[in-house]
From Swiss-Prot:
Protein name, UniProt field: Ankyrin repeat and SOCS box protein 7
Keywords noted in UniProt: ANK repeat, Repeat, Ubl conjugation pathway
Keyword Translocase set for record: no
Record-level GO BP terms: intracellular signal transduction; protein ubiquitination
Taxonomic lineage of the native organism: Eukaryota, Metazoa, Chordata, Craniata, Vertebrata
Start and end residues of each SOCS box domain: 265-318
The protein's annotated pathway: Protein modification; protein ubiquitination
Domain of life: Eukaryota
ANK repeat start and end residues: 13-42, 46-75, 80-109, 116-145, 149-178, 180-208, 213-242
Subunit structure: Interacts with CUL5. Interacts with RNF7. Interacts with PSRC1.
């Protein structure tokens, strides 16, 4: 029946023929049909052009031919408003992406947003395509674009536990304190101590509270009775006297759960009773003065290595 329908509809027959050629990587047939006048910008029922199709299938040579014959990479499909670059990001097709990014359309596609406000960088971070993330940033993609829900690529990488993408984005100065400190609080809530340590080492603000209740990372550590997180936060300068919207300090939160002895409660009682020593106060202040984006330059300071290591918290017993 389909064959009969195709015979009566030559346009559909041509569409299926060129799609089959792309799927098979038959560049000769693709080129021949384009030279005979077939448009590379025709769209199927899903709004896909041949560029969408070949990018998703990983057919690099076909992508090159389509671009040579005027394919438009700015076209968005009808599924989610995705460009061919979004699909290349989804499947990690970095070589194909480079072809599109080296075209005259680069500025129009590199930060193009889907119907949900996702850029190709959102997609690459979500799927953990670290080489693709690097490529987009090499071509100067915006590092902190916001989706319609206010989410950045870094947040997606954290939630999906894409560690390599997280590090790459942070190395390119992604905002570690986005959404009033979401990342550090998320790491605490998930008891992800490696992320928690990474964010603190890179200068995350320890005292930013949730907008809905004012709970800081230290409050959340108390709620979870996570003494390791609490120690890390305290060592990096978390204020034990910060209050949530109910007027509770982290210690008060810990006591409200249970007054009986527990590791986190015992620790909070200990550090709340006595002030920080001058040495630790100096470290906290120096790191603040150096600033978030310059902490990675600590090694360039004209000071003794032991001081650099101290500023990096290398002697912490956690």
């Amino acid at each position: 029946m389909l064959h009969h329908h195709c015979r009566r509809n030559p346009e559909l027959q041509e569409e299926l023929q060129i799609q089959a050629a792309v799927a098979a990587g038959d560049v000769h047939t693709v080129r021949k049909m384009l030279e005979q006048g077939y448009s590379p910008n025709g769209r199927d029922a899903n709004g896909w052009t041949l560029l969408h199709f070949s990018a998703a299938r990983g057919k690099e040579r076909c992508v090159r031919v389509f671009l040579e014959h005027g394919a438009d990479p700015t076209v968005k499909d009808l599924i989610g408003g995705f460009t061919a670059l979004h699909y290349a990001a989804m499947h990690g097709r970095a070589r194909i992406a480079r072809l599109m990014l080296e075209s005259e359309y680069r500025s129009d596609i590199i930060n193009a947003k889907s119907n949900d406000g996702w850029t190709p960088l959102h997609v690459a971070a979500h799927y953990g395509r670290d080489s693709f993330v690097r490529l987009l940033l090499e071509f100067k993609a915006e590092v902190d674009p916001l989706s319609d829900k206010g989410t950045t690529p870094l947040q997606l990488a954290i939630i999906r536990e894409r560690s390599s993408c997280v590090k790459i984005l942070l190395d390119h100065n992604a905002n570690i304190d986005i959404q009033n400190g979401f990342l550090l609080r998320y790491a605490v809530i998930k008891s992800n101590h490696s992320y928690c340590r990474m964010f603190l080492q890179r200068g995350a603000d320890t005292d930013l509270g949730r907008l809905e209740d004012g709970q800081t990372p230290l409050h959340l550590s108390a709620l979870r009775d996570d003494v390791l997180c609490a120690r890390m936060l305290y060592n990096y300068g978390a204020d034990t006297n910060t209050r949530n919207y109910e007027g509770q300090t982290p210690l008060a939160v810990s006591i409200s759960i249970s007054g009986s002895s527990r590791p986190c409660l015992d620790f909070l009682q200990e550090v709340t009773r006595q002030p920080r020593n001058l040495q630790d106060l100096c470290r906290i202040k120096i790191r603040q003065c150096i600033g978030l984006q310059n902490l990675k330059l600590l090694d360039e300071l004209p000071i003794a290595k032991v001081m650099k290591d101290y500023l990096k918290h290398k002697f912490d017993d956690i």
